[in-house]
């Protein structure tokens, strides 16, 4: 699992993902570290919700941020999460965290040959722009 460096602290994205996955409305999630001028990297959560969730996205995000703060600690600096329709994966089911990180950091990336559905990357990019994470 990935290790990100947040203000000199090494954090496991997997540990944050475990906490997010405990939320009753989250079907699956991914955490990536994106570049930050002040802290080096900051964690961003991508949340795919369970079908039929009635709770507002803002409430789910707020609860997820509080859960990470409580269980991982304030050192995680986890303050940003977005709700996405689905996560980009390989045909074998592995989440393409590296590709998503490159998109979020506005770096060039290659379309992975093993991607399950290439259209997902455009969806993720649109979500990142809409949530002001990716600034073009």
Regions found by a protein language model. Give the residues of each.
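Short arginine-rich
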Residues: 102-108
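A cross-kingdom feature marking charged/low-complexity
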Residues: 123-136
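AMP-binding/adenylate-forming catalytic core of the ANL superfamily
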Residues: 1-76, 86, 91-95, 99-102, ...
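General small-molecule cofactor/ligand-binding pocket signal
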Residues: 81-84
């Amino acid at each position: 699992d990935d290790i990100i460096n947040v203000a000199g602290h090494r954090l496991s994205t997997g540990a944050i993902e475990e906490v997010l996955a405990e939320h009753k409305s989250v079907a699956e999630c991914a955490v990536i570290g994106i570049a930050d001028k002040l802290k080096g990297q900051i964690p961003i959560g991508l949340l795919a919700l369970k079908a039929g969730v009635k709770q507002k996205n803002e409430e789910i995000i707020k609860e997820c941020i509080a859960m990470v703060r409580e269980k991982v600690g304030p050192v995680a600096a986890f303050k940003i999460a977005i709700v996405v329709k689905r996560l980009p994966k390989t045909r074998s089911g592995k989440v393409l965290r590296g590709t998503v990180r490159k998109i979020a950091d506005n770096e060039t990336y290659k379309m992975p040959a093993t991607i399950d559905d290439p259209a997902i990357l455009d969806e993720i990019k649109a979500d990142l722009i809409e949530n002001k994470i990716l600034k073009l």
